[in-house]
């Protein structure tokens, strides 16, 4: 009798804990309202819906070895995963999924995303920030003949150039605007630019004849050059050639500007020659925030840590009246003139960029740079209407399956079937609680796994009931028939459940996305099914026997 009470208490305690785990709770989420992210308090059921149930975007990312050779991909992806997860958390996506798939890929699932291109850019952007002084020694002019010679030898001409690379077709800016971008990037320590807004006349080529000497023209600040849009593909291709990279003057690097430039009907690109050693990098940033400057428009204000502020002030103090390029992912965003030393606080001007672009840049800077460049191996966009349709069909399938099971069990096994149905209800609650406890994401394949586990839970009861029937047919008492029925069916139940759980573990380990969702739900359902079949259903029989002492028959 005491043992029976403990059984009942355990079942009741687990049921109460499961209901508590599934009860809607108050959470604080970062949500977007009228284009601005704010923190809001909402109530949510702890079960997360996957992309196929609410729509969104699925990304598969892998290391881009064309940009950087990585010795240990798995370790690099572990570090990249932390950065991507932090970016997604700040992006304001509710219930995202960021996980590794094997040792070479990252899976990112963003439910409810309506701007897929923007989300992909935030996830994939390397966000490596550098502050570098522009060249004052005319180093490029000294090697232009050598560059021309190499380009001619390799057959690189304007006619042979290809279309501009993706990501280099940014917004257009007037040449006059770019060449007069000398306003300082720091609120607390710099003054206005030394140039004026007067019309700019592009100077004649440095030399004549070759690819570089014909198409590379000096700008109005040291280290800046202007390249016609028509020559950009060829120049970019040439600058990636190993021989030209080797001929770059020691201690210098060549970087393109972010914007495409306009002068009348002509379009140009800005090219910069910079000191290779950066003054500081984004590693010393402690904060970055979007803001609106009355002069510069939308900007990103940043704050440095103590070491970064000390180094920045010292280095910028050495380069007063020089130009300092702010370089993001090897593209020059702006190159203001330093009118005085800069301390802890500063800002990055975006040259007419939108508030949203300022928000995104601040977000990725706060999260930090990716340790390795990533490329998109696969992208899938799932509409919200498709997700809603999946929910209705999935719930319908689950409801029909449950109804048929309940009716068949009650009709075929009568009173024993009723006990099995009650145990099945507890099984459903336990399974959902397990999924909520492990923060599992419910997907359409997951619902299929749920239905399959229901079938296996019912099958376990069928095995037990048939064994009990056999024992009763052999003339054994009701109590003995129940005990023997459970004992003889136990081995088969454990064997089949264990084999299926192992299969689910293999699917989870080597599968991705939907396959993992199926595996998680299947495993959770089988664990709950084992408990309810072996322990809960047996307890119900014991309660019935205790209240019906002397009963010689069993409705089964």
From Swiss-Prot:
Location(s), subcellular? Cell inner membrane
Q: Does the keyword Amino-acid biosynthesis apply?
A: no
Is Disulfide bond set as a keyword in this record?
no
The UniProt keywords, alphabetically, are: Cell inner membrane, Cell membrane, Membrane, Protein transport, Translocation, Transmembrane, Transmembrane helix, Transport
A cellular component annotation (GO) from this entry:
plasma membrane
Q: How does it sit in the membrane?
A: Multi-pass membrane protein
UniProt superkingdom = Bacteria
Its GO biological process annotations read: intracellular protein transmembrane transport; protein targeting; protein transport by the Sec complex
List all membrane-crossing ranges. 8-28, 391-411, 418-438, 445-465, 488-508, 517-537
Query: One GO molecular function term?
Result: protein-transporting ATPase activity
List the Pfam families hit by this protein, alphabetically. Sec_GG (PF07549), SecD_1st (PF21760), SecD_SecF_C (PF02355), SecDF_P1_head (PF22599)
To which protein family does this belong? Belongs to the SecD/SecF family. SecD subfamily.
Question: Which PANTHER family does this UniProt record tie to the protein?
Answer: PROTEIN TRANSLOCASE SUBUNIT SECD (PTHR30081:SF1), PROTEIN-EXPORT MEMBRANE PROTEIN SEC (PTHR30081)
Function, in words: Part of the Sec protein translocase complex. Interacts with the SecYEG preprotein conducting channel. SecDF uses the proton motive force (PMF) to complete protein translocation after the ATP-dependent function of SecA.
Assembly, per entry: Forms a complex with SecF. Part of the essential Sec protein translocation apparatus which comprises SecA, SecYEG and auxiliary proteins SecDF. Other proteins may also be involved.
Which protein, by its recorded name, is this? Protein translocase subunit SecD
Instruction: Name the species this protein comes from.
Output: Gemmatimonas aurantiaca (strain DSM 14586 / JCM 11422 / NBRC 100505 / T-27)
Q: Which gene encodes it?
A: secD
């Amino acid at each position: 009798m005491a043992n029976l009470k403990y059984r009942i208490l355990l079942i009741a305690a687990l049921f109460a804990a499961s209901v508590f785990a599934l009860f809607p709770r108050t959470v604080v989420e970062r949500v977007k309202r009228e284009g601005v992210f704010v923190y809001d308090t909402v109530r949510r059921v702890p079960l997360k819906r996957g992309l196929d149930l609410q729509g969104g975007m699925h990304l598969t990312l892998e290391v881009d070895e064309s940009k950087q050779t990585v010795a240990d991909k798995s370790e690099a992806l572990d570090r990249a995963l932390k950065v991507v997860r932090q970016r997604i958390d700040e992006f304001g996506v509710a219930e995202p999924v960021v996980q590794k798939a094997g040792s070479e890929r990252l899976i990112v699932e963003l439910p409810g995303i309506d701007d897929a291109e923007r989300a992909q850019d935030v996830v994939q952007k390397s966000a490596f920030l550098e502050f570098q002084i522009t060249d004052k020694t005319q180093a490029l002019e000294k090697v232009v003949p050598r560059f021309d010679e190499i380009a001619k030898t390799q057959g690189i001409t304007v006619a042979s150039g290809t279309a501009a690379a993706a990501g280099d077709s940014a917004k257009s800016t007037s040449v006059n605007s770019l060449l007069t971008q000398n306003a300082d990037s720091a609120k607390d320590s710099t003054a206005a630019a030394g140039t004026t807004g007067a019309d700019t006349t592009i100077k004649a080529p440095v030399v004549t004849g070759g690819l570089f000497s014909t198409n590379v023209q000096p700008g109005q600040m040291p280290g800046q050059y202007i390249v016609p849009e028509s020559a950009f593909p060829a120049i970019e291709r040439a600058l990636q050639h190993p021989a030209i990279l080797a001929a770059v003057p020691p201690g210098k690097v060549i970087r393109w500007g972010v914007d495409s430039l306009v002068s009348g009907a002509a379009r140009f690109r800005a090219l910069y020659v910079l000191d290779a050693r950066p003054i500081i990098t984004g590693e010393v940033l402690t904060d970055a925030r979007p803001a609106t400057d009355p002069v510069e428009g939308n900007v990103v204000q940043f704050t440095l840590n103590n070491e970064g502020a000390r180094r920045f002030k010292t280095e910028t103090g050495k380069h007063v009246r020089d130009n300092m390029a702010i370089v993001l992912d090897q593209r020059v965003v702006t190159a203001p003139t330093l009118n005085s030393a800069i301390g802890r606080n500063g800002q990055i001007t975006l040259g007419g960029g939108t508030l949203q672009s300022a928000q995104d840049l601040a977000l990725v800077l706060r999260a930090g740079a990716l340790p390795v460049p990533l490329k998109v191996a696969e992208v899938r966009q799932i509409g919200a209407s498709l997700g809603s349709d999946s929910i209705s069909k999935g719930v319908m399938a689950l409801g029909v399956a449950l109804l048929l099971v309940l009716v068949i069990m009650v009709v075929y096994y009568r009173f024993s079937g009723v006990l099995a149905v009650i145990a099945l209800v507890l099984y459903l609650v336990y399974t959902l609680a397990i999924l909520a406890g492990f923060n599992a994401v419910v997907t359409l394949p997951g619902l299929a796994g749920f239905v399959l586990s229901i079938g296996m839970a019912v099958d376990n009861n069928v095995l037990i009931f048939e064994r009990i029937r056999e024992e009763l047919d052999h003339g054994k008492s009701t109590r003995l028939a129940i005990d023997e029925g459970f004992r003889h069916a136990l081995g088969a139940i454990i064997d089949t459940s264990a084999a299926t759980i192992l299969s689910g573990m293999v699917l989870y380990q080597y599968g991705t996305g939907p396959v993992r969702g199926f595996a998680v739900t299947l495993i959770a359902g089988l664990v709950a099914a084992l408990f309810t079949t072996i322990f809960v259903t047996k307890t119900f029989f014991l309660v019935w026997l205790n209240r019906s002492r002397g009963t010689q028959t069993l409705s089964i």
